[in-house]
Amino acid sequence: MFYLTSTLYMMLKHNLAKIYSYIKSKVSMAIEHFSTLKQHLSDQIIGQPAFVENLLIALLANGHLIVEGPPGLAKTRAVNALAEGLEADFHRIQFTPDLLPADLTGTDTYRPEDGSFVFQAGPLFQNLVLADEINRAPAKVQSALLEAMAEGQVTVGRKTYQLPELFLVMATQNPIEQEGTYPLPEAQLDRFLMHLEINYPDATSELAILKLNRGEALTDVNHDKPTLRVLSQSEIFDARKQVLNIHMAPSLEAYMVDLIIATRQPEKYDDKLSSWLAYGASPRATIALDRCARARAWLHNRDFVSPEDIQAVLHNVLRHRIILSYQAEAEGVTSNQLLDHLLSLVAVA
């Protein structure tokens, strides 16, 4: 049998303390860098704090966003500002009815001088992609984008090409103009990590937007833009690993599962919930809820997930994954109201 001497025990204890201190300082530094990025985004996207936080949650959880809101709410600006703060490139794609899959993925170009074909990569090979008004393009174009999101690769001809490891898509939908649109099927919507709803800013925020716009015009004239610390891709990948190591109590894992199962078996909880729900969420929703709750806890400088984290991201994770019944639509019930009711019925384990 092996016995530890007091000297060896103290050495091991000291070394473990040093390792723990190093890990803790590394996590703190990563959170500090993300806090700086969050402040940069907040300075650029005024009056939308929830939008800013959820953009970072998607980045940390390695997922994609669909954003619904009226035009002019800085959706393009948000992704552009995010690209400025990251070691990443950015491309905006305006979806239109005449768009082709090759306009996204790229195409093989013929070279007459040697009779060969050379692949010209499309905009999907950028790190950050804004798919503006995704519901204006036909289904085959939407499918090309969603294949890239789900598989991290695109297929052109007989060849498959890998997309960058850092790859985030933010798709937008305009809730006002619905003529000439191609709504995404529920199975395709499920590929998005979160569905965000953004609204107009209040009067105070709009005044701040005016001042920001004037200040930027002067900055462009004077060529005096402030420098910003750029997060490297390796720092982002390290932060994602830290997020996966966030502690979640078994009781909270059970709570998440109960919330999702309640959308599939609403009759066990409440007649009202049962009458409002046509279809519930898939296991992909449970995975998304877990990843987003962990990312939120990490952003709030905690090494554990709380019930508040789960409840804070629930609406964005489930909004596009549940289907309301005809009765709910007739009563004017929204997805948000249904999810509020769901939270009131399912208790924390």
Per-range role (PLM):
Residues 23, 27, 265-349:
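C-terminal engagement/docking regions of AAA+ P-loop ATPases
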Residues 27-51:
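Dynamic helix-loop-helix/coil hinge segments at AAA+ ATPase domain boundaries and subdomain interfaces
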Residues 54, 111-130:
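Conserved alpha-helical scaffold flanking the Walker A/P-loop in AAA+ ATPase domains
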Residues 59-96:
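Walker A/P-loop
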Residues 85-113:
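AAA+/P-loop NTPase substrate/partner-engagement loops
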Residues 125-150, 164, 181-188, 200-208:
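Conserved AAA+/SF3 P-loop NTPase catalytic/coupling segment centered on the Walker-B
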